[in-house]
A protein has these predicted regions:
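Membrane-embedded alpha-helical bundles of multi-pass transporters/translocases
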Residues: 2-322
Length: 322
């Protein structure tokens, strides 16, 4: 009984070991390094390195986001209906990681194409990037709630991968341009925006991505789902559930708005510093803001034990406006 009190663990719940928690969290480093390089610098690469028309890039990004809105729930259904001896998440995490790593590198390498061929190539690669990222990302975050069924423990566990994700975002956003420039210098390129630096940086991140996910896959247990009965939910049924749940719709609306604002800020910030401030390297200072996000993640588990989630959310929304 004394041991149960000291650990605050309940026998009816399952818990992941400390090793599993951190090995799972490490997996977020590579995936979010990829996500942040694309989110922060892909548009700059398209317009200032490949010299694609900004209007075309904007339309491409919009079409890709619309397709993602369809693609994401489909992948969720696929994961939910997967039954293998490796579980339902691990197999897709491996497949998605390998596919996305290859497409990610190809996204930052044009093979010296030009004209219509380049526009077609970029369009195909970017759509494929979004699809392969979804194949990896959906099972990764879906795996998280299965590490423990204790609601309070889930709050603590969820902080770990998000902290590592923020660390990856901080590293790429703050040092990305410097690394690309340095890689171009090593390759003998004189232009900061030369494609070589982007390609080499993408290869480095892809390797980190594969290693990080490998640490997750080989160190985090997932129970076999062979023979496990679970009621199947079709995509049509899922959409009906969403439409009938007004609270869920409100939450989805908040997430969409938040992600829209975040993506706009990340994509256009480097242009602001380059065109308005006259120095794109000031974007690195902007990247230091992620430290505040990391501090918030560290504080959240303790804060959530003192005040309700509703108040935590309200305060978090108010802080950026203060």
């Amino acid at each position: 009984m004394s041991n149960q009190k000291s650990t605050n663990k309940h026998p009816q719940y399952k818990y992941a070991s400390t090793r599993e928690k951190y090995c799972f969290g490490i997996g977020a480093i590579g995936k979010d390094a990829i996500c942040n390089l694309v989110g922060s610098f892909l548009m700059l690469y398209f317009t200032d390195t490949l010299y694609l028309a900004p209007a075309f890039v904007g339309v491409l990004f919009l079409v890709a986001r619309i397709w993602d809105a369809i693609n994401d729930p489909v992948m969720g259904m696929i994961c939910d209906n997967t039954h293998t001896k490796f579980g339902k998440f691990r197999i897709w995490l491996v497949i998605g990681t390998l596919l996305n790593s290859v497409v990610f590198v190809l996204l930052f390498h044009s093979f010296h194409l030009s004209g219509t061929s380049l526009y077609i190539y970029v369009s195909v690669m970017y759509i494929l990037y979004g699809m392969t990222y979804t194949i990896m990302d959906v099972p990764y975050w879906s795996w998280l709630p299965n590490l423990t069924n204790d609601p309070h423990e889930r709050e603590k566990v969820s902080v770990i991968p998000r902290f590592f994700a923020s660390l990856a975002g901080f590293s790429v956003a703050t040092f990305g341009l410097y690394i690309i420039n340095h890689l171009n210098k090593i390759a003998g390129e004189k232009n900061l925006y030369a494609e070589t630096g982007y390609t080499l940086f993408a290869i480095i991140i892809a390797v980190i991505f594969i290693v990080a996910i490998g640490i997750t896959v080989f160190n985090v247990k997932e129970e076999s789902t062979i023979g496990v009965y679970a009621e199947k939910t079709s995509l049509k049924q899922a959409f009906r559930i969403i439409i009938k749940n007004d609270q869920l719709l409100a939450f989805i609306g908040i997430l969409l708005t938040f992600n829209l604002c975040t993506q706009i800020a990340k994509s256009f910030a480097v242009y602001y510093f380059k065109c308005v401030c006259g120095n794109e390297y000031l974007y690195s200072i902007f990247g230091f803001a992620i430290i505040a996000e990391m501090a918030g993640l560290v504080c959240y588990p303790k804060i959530s034990t003192k005040i309700s989630r509703e108040k935590v959310y309200a305060y978090a929304c108010a802080l950026p406006l203060a």
